Amino acid sequence: MNEELTFEEEMMRLEEIVNTLEKGNLRLEESFNLFKEGVEISKRLEKRLSEVEGKITLLINENEEIDFKEEEKDV
């Protein structure tokens, strides 16, 4: 897939893959290809989540620094 999908779209695709694989009515090669696609999607989703987690951590840390500096001014 060359187009950039949203996080939610990739989650939906991963759910489709899981549901299809759980049915168990595919040939081995088809199952393998779907499994491979699912692993690739999972890696991209994990990377996106890690990036967002890092941004959240930065925002929290920046906010704590601001709060701490404001407390110092009050003293």
Swiss-Prot record:
GO terms for molecular function: exodeoxyribonuclease VII activity. The keyword Hydrolase applies. Coiled coil: none annotated. It is found in: Cytoplasm. GO terms for biological process: DNA catabolic process. It is an enzyme of class 3 (hydrolase). It catalyses: Exonucleolytic cleavage in either 5'- to 3'- or 3'- to 5'-direction to yield nucleoside 5'-phosphates. Pfam families: Exonuc_VII_S. Its EC number is 3.1.11.6. Keywords: Cytoplasm, Exonuclease, Hydrolase, Nuclease. GO terms for cellular component: cytosol; exodeoxyribonuclease VII complex. NCBIfam families: xseB. Bidirectionally degrades single-stranded DNA into large acid-insoluble oligonucleotides, which are then degraded further into small acid-soluble oligonucleotides. Belongs to the XseB family. Heterooligomer composed of large and small subunits. HAMAP family: Exonuc_7_S (MF_00337). This is Exodeoxyribonuclease 7 small subunit. It comes from Thermoanaerobacter pseudethanolicus (strain ATCC 33223 / 39E) (Clostridium thermohydrosulfuricum).
